[in-house]
Amino acid sequence: AGCQQFLPEGITLDEFKSTEINPNVGIMQSQKVGPAIADDITQSAVWAVLAALLGIFLYVLARFRNFAFSVGALTGLAHNTLIVLGAYALLWKVMPFSMEIDQAFIAAILTVIGYSINDTVVIFDRVREYTSLYPKRDRKQNINDALNHTLSRTFSTSMSTLVVLVAIFCFGGETIRGFVFALLIGVVVGTYSSLCVATPLAFDIQEAMDRRKAKKAELKK
């Protein structure tokens, strides 16, 4: 009854839905997105994220020639991805806007991965520079100085990005708020992980590799 006023005169709802009675009036075409298509989209999204992580791992390895840096960067990016996914899972029915896991969300995840690696590479590059300038100095001191000298640059870049994202979130409209919300979380977490996850982990891995080499050298003697 509620839809009758929108139907052509003399056409019932059943006649409108039927494609056999009058093919020129009514529902001309309909499609259903079934579980098979949804599974295909999910699988493609997972492969896209894994391909991005693998590509960045190989890029860092080729640029710095250091396995510890590659593992540290990859762990930081995986950490960022899981935090964004966890935030969406926790706040899915809490936030007053759409937070569906769709193509826009996957695009946000890939954007966060690309943004986060930028800060990490800058820090790693400064660590490599200090290691070349002061090869005899303690590695921990070189990493600490690298973090201190890139801290202002990291925070300035992140804050300018956050200001833009907050403006888009507030005034950009309802349809993109879920996408921008994922970026907001990703930028904050990515800044933290570059400073407090990727770099310290790279240091720990390098120290462990050095200890293993020292033990092997002692055994050969």
Predicted region positions:
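A structural signal for conserved, well-ordered secondary-structure elements
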Residues: 1-221
